[in-house]
Structure formats: structure tokens, C-alpha cells
């Protein structure tokens, strides 16, 4: 690949160099007389700042590389074919996610990216390096992750969140964002849940924020769609605005959460498929929990909610299943409401297609 160098420019700057082009809104891409070391110095993490010279097919996936593999590489003839000026291999060996240079702070969205990497390589024991945590904190102190209409757009932030949601340990991304004090900059509504108590009888984990991440973890274990995982993450936002005098109870938190979900979706420019499911799960999840006690009229209203397209109702029910089991000690609890409502939904679809609505009532 051609070595390149990205530098911060003034907003909307149009470079004169014919070999340059604008990147995002305030980056300029240079390709003239750029060395490979200069190129690598602009990469976000040291583990991504390794290049191989022509002659070595270096394609080992990070998650499959053991310390023994790296030691062999260090002691083999192939080491001479690697360009590793920032000790990326050493950081792989030490399981460290470390920024390559101060250039990391020129694109604050990298904060989300490194937490996404922490989620991806969580099972391999990777952690964010302390010096990188310090750099991130200095960036946040300068409010550099504030979402705006220039470089830090809602779309760019959500793109990283979307990628993070697809990881097997998606909850780790948000734990890391919370630990870095970065979550409040991108999703303050979610951050506000931490420290808010719930009734221990139903929520042994007590903390509303912890519960939300447990629900996301369950959604990942159930291999639910990204849209469903996003809905799982936001389903209890209303608990963050409960009157403190009413705690630990949260009567009406479903309705209270809907405008908060809408705020998140608007700020991050979330696609309709995500916002639609997140809104309905937030508003109606208690109805699914009480499915066996609902009357025909309420059930019909749920099934006939025209906001849900195709088979999104099934995703809705499955997120509620994740909610019921995303609680301390209840991870393997049965949830018959899911089978009950999915069977009703299938009957509903059949009755509507055959124009026999009474079959559902029966």
C-alpha cells in the first residue's frame, strides 16, 4: 500500500497539492515523500502500526497469536522483514492496547475505537494501557469528544457503536467507556443509570446501569441482531430520571424513557431500524413480562403495532427475554413469556393473512 500521512488542517481547507485530498472535514492526506515510519506514526494503536516488507506474508490474526508465536517471530529470520518502530509486537505480547503517538488525539472518535478493540480482544486478556488512559482523560478534560456537526458527528460516533455492538462482548465496550469517563460524553442518558438502585427482589444486581449492561451481555449470548442489542442497552433509560424520593421503585419508567431514547437516536443519527425497535422495547417491555396476564385487547394492540416491520416483533420479545435474564443469578432462568408471545404472533400473522381475526381470540 502507498505510504500516506494524515495531518489536521483548518476546517474545510482545500489543499493545493494535487496528491492530497480532504479527509472528513479537517484532515489533509499527503502522499509525497512519506516514509513508512511516518505513515505508521499516524496510526491509532501500536498493534496497528506494524508493516511487513515485500517478501513476507504476515496475516496472522491478532486473536490467534500466542506469546509463543510472537517469540518465534522475534527469533526467526522473518523479524528482519517487519517494520515495527513502535514495538507493536511487544504490546501484543503484553496484551496492551496502546496509542502509537500523540496523533491519537487528533481524532477523538479513536476513544470509541479503542474501547471497541477492548471488547473484541477481551477474551484474550487485552487491556487499555495506563498511558493511553491518561491521554484519553486529558482529551476528555478538553471536551474533545463533544458531538458536533464538524469532525465529531453523530454518524461517526454511532458507526463505532454499531461495530462495537457486533462484538461477542459488546458490553465491555460500554464498561470501558464508563471507566474512562467517556460514556457521559456520547450517551449521558445511559451513564446516568449507574448508581441508580432498583428493588433487590427483582434486581439482585441493584444498580440500573449494571443491569443494562447485563441485558446487553445476554442479548449477545442469544446472538441477537445489532438492532436488538441496541434496544437492550437503552430499554431502561427512564430509570435515570425517576424521582429520588420514589427509589428504588420505578413506576412509569417505560414511558419516561421513550423521549430519552429518542434523544439518543437523534443525537447519534441512528438508522430507523435501530430507533424503531429501541423505542418500542423501552415503551412496552413490561407488557411482555406480564404476557400471561394480558387481556385479548392489549395483546391484539401489541401484535398490531404498525411501527414494527416484518418480523421485528420477534426481536422485541427476545430483547424482553434478555431483560428478564440479564439480572444477577437469573442468567439461566426460564422465560415462558417468549414462547407464548411468539406463538401468538405467528397465529396473528396467519389470521391476518387468512382474514380470520377471531382465530387469534380463540
Where are these regions (language model features)?
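Catalytic cores of the polymerase beta-like nucleotidyltransferase superfamily
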Residues: 1-362
Amino acid at each position: 500500500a502507498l505510504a500516506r500521512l494524515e495531518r489536521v488542517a483548518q476546517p474545510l481547507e482545500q489543499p493545493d497539492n494535487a496528491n492530497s485530498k480532504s479527509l472528513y472535514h479537517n484532515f489533509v492526506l499527503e502522499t509525497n515523500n512519506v516514509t513508512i515510519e511516518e505513515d505508521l506514526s499516524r496510526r491509532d494503536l501500536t498493534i496497528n502500526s506494524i508493516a511487513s516488507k515485500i517478501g513476507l506474508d504476515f496475516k496472522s490474526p491478532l486473536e490467534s497469536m500466542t506469546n509463543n508465536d510472537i517469540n518465534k517471530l522475534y527469533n526467526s529470520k522473518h523479524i528482519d522483514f517487519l517494520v515495527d518502530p513502535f514495538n507493536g509486537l511487544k504490546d501484543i505480547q503484553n496484551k496492551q492496547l496502546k496509542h502509537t503517538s500523540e496523533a491519537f488525539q487528533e481524532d477523538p472518535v479513536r476513544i470509541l475505537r479503542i474501547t471497541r478493540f477492548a471488547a473484541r480482544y477481551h477474551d484474550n486478556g487485552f487491556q487499555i494501557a495506563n498511558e493511553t488512559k491518561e491521554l484519553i482523560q486529558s482529551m476528555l478534560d478538553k471536551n474533545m469528544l463533544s458531538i458536533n456537526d464538524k469532525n465529531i458527528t453523530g454518524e461517526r460516533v454511532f458507526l463505532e457503536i454499531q461495530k462495537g455492538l457486533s462484538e461477542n462482548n459488546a458490553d465491555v465496550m460500554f464498561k470501558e467507556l464508563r471507566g474512562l469517563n467517556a460514556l457521559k460524553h456520547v450517551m449521558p442518558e445511559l451513564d446516568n443509570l449507574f448508581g441508580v438502585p432498583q428493588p433487590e427482589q427483582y434486581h439482585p444486581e441493584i444498580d440500573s446501569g449494571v443491569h443494562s449492561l447485563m441485558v446487553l451481555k445476554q442479548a449477545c449470548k442469544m446472538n441477537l441482531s445489532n438492532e436488538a442489542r441496541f434496544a437492550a442497552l437503552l430499554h431502561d433509560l427512564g430509570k435515570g430520571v425517576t424521582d429520588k424520593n420514589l427509589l428504588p421503585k420505578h413506576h412509569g419508567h417505560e414511558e419516561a424513557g421513550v423521549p430519552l431514547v429518542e434523544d439518543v437516536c437523534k443525537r447519534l443519527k441512528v438508522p430507523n431500524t435501530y430507533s424503531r425497535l429501541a423505542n418500542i422495547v423501552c415503551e412496552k417491555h413490561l407488557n411482555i413480562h406480564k404476557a400471561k396476564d394480558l387481556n385479548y385487547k392489549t395483546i391484539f394492540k401489541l401484535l398490531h403495532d404498525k411501527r414494527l416491520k416484518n418480523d421485528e416483533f420477534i426481536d422485541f420479545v427476545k430483547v424482553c427475554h434478555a431483560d428478564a435474564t440479564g439480572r444477577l443469578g437469573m442468567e439461566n432462568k426460564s422465560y415462558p413469556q417468549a414462547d407464548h408471545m411468539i406463538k401468538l404472533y405467528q397465529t396473528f400473522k396467519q389470521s391476518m393473512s387468512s382474514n380470520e381475526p377471531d382465530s387469534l381470540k380463540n
